[in-house]
Amino acid sequence: MQEISDLSFFQDKGNVLILTGCSKNKLNTEQEVPAEELYTGTLFRFVKEYADSINADLYIISAKYGLISRNTLIKTYDKVLRTYADAESLRPEIERELSLLHGGYDQILVIAGDKYRRTLKGIADERYYFLKTSGIGHTLHLLKEQIS
């Protein structure tokens, strides 16, 4: 696993998977909707747009549902990874699900906070790249640069 501070490396780089955390801001609905429609936070929206721009698959680490694809039908919920202990309790499930999924990818880009990244610590290999920035504003700036 490597930390990176620039996203230009991922332009036209083969089969890429992007992992991101769920969003606190969600669509207010009682219906099941695709995860990509449920999460409405700014960072999530930019990560989704970036994934589309480089033709990458997008999966979400959800505090409630575990590892889900952007198309997984889910309902609104109120659960976040508040502590590292929360992340550790979710880690075995995330690692199990990723072990079935990540073999088909050349590179795996993680755009998520520390607690969400903690769920990957036992499975991240040399294909994993963790975007390391000075904060959410910097992350949004990097994503905007690549999208436009």
What is each of the regions a protein language model found here?
Residues M1-S148:
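Peripheral peptide segments
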